[in-house]
Swiss-Prot record:
Keywords: Amino-acid biosynthesis, Aromatic amino acid biosynthesis, Lyase, Schiff base. The active site is at H133, K160. This is 3-dehydroquinate dehydratase. It catalyses: 3-dehydroquinate = 3-dehydroshikimate + H2O. It is an enzyme of class 4 (lyase). It comes from Staphylococcus aureus (strain JH9). The keyword Transcription does not apply. Homodimer. One of its GO terms (biological process) is amino acid biosynthetic process. Pathway: Metabolic intermediate biosynthesis; chorismate biosynthesis; chorismate from D-erythrose 4-phosphate and phosphoenolpyruvate: step 3/7. NCBIfam families: aroD. Belongs to the type-I 3-dehydroquinase family. InterPro entries: Aldolase_TIM, DHquinase_I, Type-I_3-dehydroquinase. GO terms for molecular function: 3-dehydroquinate dehydratase activity.
């Protein structure tokens, strides 16, 4: 069983308000990583992100900061695609205070560009979470394993795969794929079976070799997320 860090996802509209800081402080003991989603901000700029990071730095000794721009293609709000998306991700490396950066994987990506950007982020001491999301279904077990394998070839610190289950076998396949990957590969793995049906993948993440589990502060930012306070309590049971 692996040690699991609890990620709290926030998605402020334009800035970090005092009420949000209070909500974070109220849950500070449950948070290992704070994920700042920025895809909900239309035409977001690096300067806007830097300003938000500055406000969060006050509490940063308590947790690591992960920045994520989730595109519409993978279930987010982000309109940036191709070079616009990759340029934003690359430019995030210049912001002090960011510890981790999410970069999406698709089967048709430009491999050389992705490799170059991931190395660039790592040169600036940012941990890379390479991720893939399927909000429609859960692929067969062999395809899940293949996606994990393809993502780890970029040598990230974390590989993350989130899929939507339609039955309990979908959940079991995701957990098996994650467990097998954890036993055979060096980088850390995250596997999420979304919605209430897949909740066990969030609460028992460490049992199957996972390193991160994602929760929310108040309103869920993804199907199946629960409040980080409850999530932390569940994770520590295992």
């Amino acid at each position: 069983m692996t040690h699991v860090e609890v990620v709290a996802t926030i998605a402020p509209q334009l800035s970090i308000e005092e009420t949000l800081i209070q909500k974070i402080n109220h849950r500070i003991d449950a948070i290992d990583v704070l994920e700042l989603r920025i895809d909900q901000i239309e035409n977001v700029t690096v300067d806007q992100v830097a300003e938000m990071i500055t406000k969060l730095k006050v509490m940063q000794d308590s947790f690591k900061l992960l920045v994520t721009y989730r595109t519409k293609l993978q279930g987010g709000y982000g309109q940036f695609i191709n070079d616009l998306y990759l340029n934003l991700i690359s430019d995030l490396a210049n912001i002090n205070g960011i510890d981790m950066i999410d970069i999406e994987w698709q089967a048709d990506i430009d491999i050389e560009k992705h490799q170059r950007i991931i190395k660039h982020l790592q040169q600036y001491n940012k941990e890379v979470v390479i991720s893939h999301h399927n909000f429609e279904s859960t692929p067969p077990l062999d395809e899940l394993q293949f996606i994990f394998f393809k993502m780890q070839k970029f040598n990230p610190e974390y590989v993350k795969l989130a899929v939507m289950p339609h039955n309990k076998n979908d959940v079991l396949n995701l957990l098996q794929a994650m467990s097998t990957f954890s036993d055979t590969m060096d980088c850390k793995v995250v596997g999420i079976s979304m919605s209430k049906l897949g909740l066990i993948s969030r609460t028992a993440q460490g049992v199957f070799g996972g390193a991160l589990t994602y929760g929310c502060i108040g309103e869920p930012q993804a199907p199946g997320q629960i409040d980080v306070t409850d999530l932390k309590a569940q994770v520590t049971l295992y």
